[in-house]
UniProtKB/Swiss-Prot annotation:
It is an enzyme of class 7 (translocase). Its main location: plastid. It is found in: Plastid, Chloroplast thylakoid membrane. This is NAD(P)H-quinone oxidoreductase chain 4, chloroplastic. It comes from Nicotiana tomentosiformis (Tobacco). Belongs to the complex I subunit 4 family. GO terms for cellular component: chloroplast thylakoid membrane.
Length: 500
């Protein structure tokens, strides 16, 4: 057990420091912005220091463990710990949240509340990734939803109330199943109810009961991921949310669903996952094709990017269901890769809207000439999204492909069919991605329009875009930097499917 509470400080610090925003002197929004950015930078530095000097990547066991008794009545503990599976998403959360606060610089209305909600969301996300107690995981999961709902309601577009209501109905409905699964696992199989994740992992369940638990957890995580047909909240939410909120949604929130599938459905319930994995493989394949085809028909720029996110999540589902080291490592790499790329695309879409005040692609065109920097950055991230070699998306999708081909669970003909359909999906990706760039930047619709508001990217936008682009290129050139974090943990998880 760790004697210095690194993880507790990392989880609590953002929301605690964020609550002090309301006590800052009224000296304009600039003080609040810089205060929030400093908190995020300090948190990211603290996290990086703790992981660099106190985390050993070659150890698959839980590290930096903290266990404090909280409520004696039903053995509820404040229990935190990290392993190779959670370190990547936690660092991604810190990086994207820091950049999202910088992206939110133009926000002036109710600035204190806005930045507090972003920091509260930060704590909830890190708490979810580091929880080793099932009920604590559920509490952190819910803590992260409330700020998103308020950010949507108060700083969204014209249809923000509809989108926020749809978001909360879907996610709250999924949370009911999550709570039922948590309580079911806690109450089964021991004289005293336990919420300890380590104890639950070593517990054996009857197959029927394990399937019931699996379905409950799967519904909760399928809403968040999202997995079709529980994805319809996502395009509406992205279409109305402020682009800094979209960065957090695409970069982190969707990845929480994928993390939950691996952490709970796969690690906690391996027998049920083995039964359901062929169906997950089919769903993931359909999702890639369906979302890519639907994205092509979207007029709204942000909705087109949202459907592209749904399509890319299909690769993660396929990697999780492949039951191979290679496939699962590819899924984890895709989680990190798409976290960067999705956040960047939504940021650039939002900053473009700030300049031209248009959101429909068929009304755009010809803005490459007055905004060459914006054109260059958007084109670069579009290339990353369509998995151009040398960028992180290419490596992640290629590893998922190898995971399916080398898997022993599936017969040769199904593997060939799935690979063929996935390849079709990869062909559709450049079609909708490149057509999006063509409609925005080429043509003549806005070519002769007054250029007063068509100012190009400033230092803030350039810094933010380059900060995201560097890890996309870095992971594409040297993916082992990310893969080495989780490779031992992946072997431990998959050993349950063959030796348990």
């Amino acid at each position: 057990m760790n004697y210095f509470p690194w993880l507790t400080i990392i989880v609590v610090f953002p929301i605690f420091a964020g609550s002090l925003i309301f006590f800052l002197p009224h000296k304009g929004n600039r003080v609040i912005r810089w205060y929030t950015i400093c908190i995020c930078i300090l948190e990211l530095l603290l996290t990086t220091y703790a992981f660099c000097y106190h985390f050993q990547s070659d150890d698959p066991l839980i590290q930096l463990v903290e266990d404090y008794k909280w409520i004696n009545f039903f053995d509820f503990h404040w229990r935190l710990g990290i392993d190779g599976l959670s370190i990547g998403p936690i660092l991604l959360t810190g990086f994207i949240t820091t950049l999202a606060t910088l992206a939110a610089w133009p926000i002036t209305r109710d600035s204190r509340l806005f930045h507090f909600l972003m920091l509260a969301m930060y704590s909830g996300q890190i708490g979810s990734f580091s929880s080793r107690d099932l009920l604590l995981f559920f509490i952190m999961w819910e803590l992260e939803l409330i700020p998103v709902y308020l950010l949507l309601c108060m700083w969204g577009g014209k249809k923000r109330l509809y989108s926020a209501t749809k978001f909360i109905l879907y996610t709250a409905g999924g949370s009911v199943f999550l709570l039922m699964g948590v309580l079911g696992v806690a109450l089964y199989g021991s004289n005293e109810p336990t919420l300890n994740f380590e104890t639950s992992v070593n517990q054996s369940y009857p197959v029927v009961l394990e399937i019931i638990f699996y379905i409950g957890f799967f519904i909760a995580f399928a809403v968040k991921s999202p997995i079709i047909p529980l994805h319809t909240w996502l395009p509406d939410t992205h279409g109305e949310a402020h682009y800094s909120t979209c960065m957090l949604l695409a970069g982190i929130l969707l990845k929480m669903g994928a993390y939950g599938l691996i952490r709970i459905n796969m690690e906690l319930l391996p027998h049920a996952h083995s039964i359901f994995s062929p169906w997950l493989m089919i769903i993931g394949t359909i999702q890639i094709i369906y979302a890519a085809s639907t994205s092509l028909g979207q007029r709204n720029l942000k909705k087109r990017i949202a459907y592209s996110s749904v399509s890319h999540m299909g690769f993660i589902i396929i990697g999780i269901s492949s039951l191979t080291d290679t496939g699962l490592n590819g899924a984890l790499l895709q989680i990190i890769s798409h976290g960067f790329i999705g956040a960047a695309l939504f940021f650039l879409a939002g900053t473009t809207y700030d300049r031209i005040r248009l959101v429909y692609l068929d009304e755009m065109g010809g803005i490459a000439s007055p905004m060459p920097k914006m054109f260059t950055m958007f084109s670069s991230f579009s290339m990353a999204s369509l998995a151009l070699p040398g960028m992180s998306g290419f490596v992640a999708e290629l590893i998922v492909f190898f995971g399916i081909i080398t898997g022993q669970k599936y017969l040769l003909i199904p593997k060939i069919l799935i690979t063929f359909v996935m390849a079709i999906g990869m062909i559709l990706t450049p079609i909708y991605s490149l057509s999006m760039s063509r409609q925005m930047f080429y043509g003549y619709k806005l070519f002769n329009a007054p250029k007063d508001s068509f100012f190009d990217s400033g230092p803030r936008e350039l810094f933010l875009s380059i900060s995201i682009f560097l890890p996309v290129i870095g992971i594409g050139i040297y993916p082992d930097f990310v893969l080495s974090l989780a490779v031992d943990k992946v072997e431990v998880i998959l050993s349950n499917f063959f030796y348990r």
